Design a protein with these regions (language model features):
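N-terminal leader regions that mediate targeting or early regulatory function
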Residues: 1-135, 140-145, 149-153, 176-180, ...
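Inter-helical turn/loop segments and adjacent helix faces that build the functional surface
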Residues: 162-173
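Charged/polar, low-hydrophobicity segments characteristic of intrinsically disordered regions
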Residues: 183-209, 222
Length: 267
């Protein structure tokens, strides 16, 4: 890593993008995962993002770079697909099968969306980026959505930071603009297609679908008395209840940007 305040790896190491694959097959792999370079990079992105929104309102003005705006436009396009793919009118017990059509459109268009968004010299990274992006909106087989899908989307944002297109000065907009738009999209998907919660904790859980929205949201209140403790506690809870839970992270993918290898402690 170039320094302690950035995730850009393009100038500090060579990488060759590959199609990401599953590596977590049992609890022993979960124990190994928390000591990997992928975990370290992801946690660094999550924590730097948290720092960028301390005491910031969603309505506060912030820098919106051209690239950040491209991502927002891409998510707006995907929102419009919901209007074009209405839910099926026939009664369905578990979710609406029209969601499968929406996911199919995402998978058909994902590469082109990334080609339009990225500069040409970074098109080689698309093979990794689309794997995380496509996994960020729910499962078409089970017609569900949960914190594992949220994790996949955040991993996509992390990868964009790793290749240098999201810069440190963009982090505030990444949360206040991009992630907020993402929440608008996935919450509408949940409502329109009646997505089942993936891995619900019931009354013992914070939320059936999201988690990081609460962590980053608590950072926005961090200067209010006691909320700093809430913020740090939510990060510990996220690690314990999401990142260390096999049913969730068994689906996580690893490539060259988020590698399943021992963490570089000096980075």
């Amino acid at each position: 890593m170039a320094d302690n305040n950035t995730l850009n790896i393009t100038n500090s190491l060579e990488y060759e993008c590959v199609e990401p694959i599953k590596k977590i097959n049992d609890q022993a792999d979960v124990n190994e995962w928390v000591n990997t370079e992928a975990f370290r990079r992801l946690m660094k992105f999550i924590e730097l993002s948290n720092e960028s929104v301390i005491n910031r309102k969603i309505s506060d003005p912030c820098l919106v770079s051209e690239f950040v705006q491209r991502i927002i436009n891409m998510l707006d396009t995907m929102l419009s697909w919901i209007d074009e793919i209405p839910p099926l009118p026939t009664p369905q017990r578990f979710g609406n099968k029209a969601f499968r059509t929406w996911i199919a459109r995402l998978e058909e268009n994902s590469v082109k969306l990334h080609q339009d968004m990225l500069p040409e010299h970074l098109h080689g990274t698309i093979v990794e980026l689309v794997a995380y992006f496509n996994g960020g909106f729910g499962n078409s087989t089970r017609i569900d959505y949960g914190s594992g899908h949220e994790l996949s989307f955040v991993a996509w944002l992390c990868c964009l930071s790793l290749i240098g297109v999201i810069k440190q000065e963009d982090y505030t907009a990444v949360i206040l603009k991009i992630f907020t738009k993402y929440l608008d999209l996935v919450r509408r998907l949940q409502r329109v297609y009646m997505l089942e919660p993936a891995g619900s904790h019931g009354v013992w859980g914070l939320d059936d679908h999201q988690f990081l929205s609460y962590y980053w949201g608590s950072a926005q209140l961090k200067e209010v008395q006691y909320w700093a403790k809430v913020n740090s506690g939510l990060l510990k809870m996220y690690i314990a209840d999401v990142l260390k839970k096999f049913p969730i992270v068994q689906h996580f993918l690893f490539g060259s940007l988020l590698p399943f290898k021992a963490a570089n402690q000096g980075g």
